[in-house]
Amino acid sequence: MAAEPTIDALGQFRLHHGLGPIGGLVNFTQSNEIMVLGTAIVLGIIALGMRQRAVVPGRLQSLVEISYNFIMGLCIEQIGHEGKKFFPFIFTLFFFVLMGNLLGLFPYFFTYTSHVAVTGGLAVLVIVLVTAVALRYHGLHFFSYFFPPGAPKALAPIIVPIEIISYLSRPVSLSIRLFANMVAGHVMFEVFATFMFLLIGALGTFGYFAALLPMTLNVTLVGFELLVAFLQAYVFAILTCIYLHDAVHLH
């Protein structure tokens, strides 16, 4: 008697070594494989799109130019003229997150942004960069950021710890927001997909008709997850720009 399908919504997030014995030797997982693939896709599109640099751009060149203008505009709008210096970092960060979100929507691919180790690592990188930029621009005066101008000095023992906790909570909120959104979407995919097979197995021919509802929900969810993939990459990038603005202008 065949075992009935069960819902294992979190099984898709388990890591395993890719590349056979070599992958196990260097601890190279399917998460790393998708990171490499995503990076190769972005670099390939940029290289192909800008190869000819035509006056009348083709589709790939237009895509690259739109991406460049979008991220550059984001940097300048949020950080100011100094934002141009941080364009390479924001551009890389945005597309690294975006590719992790998008590639995971394909069957047999892995969403590396669904692991808090990845999103947490990115968030720590952001906060370290922001702190380094603030110290580079303002030196020890950076620490005045934790005590707003005009605040009563008597409240310093209360305000300073609150501001420090608020500052240190930035990488936590950055990482959990992205991680939680990616996990939630893929768990819903798995639940609805497994539910379709459960209905077919339990109800026979009638189950095919009953499975239309969860199938329709899954198709709708794909469109929603596409939107979420872009939105979460944008949120991660714009919050990084806002933090860099605070570091540059100290307010």
UniProtKB/Swiss-Prot annotation:
SUPFAM superfamilies for the chain: F1F0 ATP synthase subunit A
GO molecular function: proton-transporting ATP synthase activity, rotational mechanism
Record carries keyword Cell membrane: yes
Keywords: ATP synthesis, Cell inner membrane, Cell membrane, CF(0), Hydrogen ion transport, Ion transport, Membrane, Transmembrane, Transmembrane helix, Transport
Keyword Cytoplasm: no
Membrane topology qualifier: Multi-pass membrane protein
Localization annotation: Cell inner membrane
Domain of life: Bacteria
Primary localization class, coarse: membrane
Membrane-spanning intervals of the chain: 28-48, 63-80, 86-106, 115-135, 154-176, 195-215, 219-239
Gene Ontology CC entries for this record: plasma membrane; proton-transporting ATP synthase complex
The family this protein is said to belong to: Belongs to the ATPase A chain family.
The protein's role, per its UniProt record: Key component of the proton channel; it plays a direct role in the translocation of protons across the membrane.
Subunit-level organization: F-type ATPases have 2 components, CF(1) - the catalytic core - and CF(0) - the membrane proton channel. CF(1) has five subunits: alpha(3), beta(3), gamma(1), delta(1), epsilon(1). CF(0) has three main subunits: a(1), b(2) and c(9-12). The alpha and beta chains form an alternating ring which encloses part of the gamma chain. CF(1) is attached to CF(0) by a central stalk formed by the gamma and epsilon chains, while a peripheral stalk is formed by the delta and b chains.
Official protein name in the record: ATP synthase subunit a
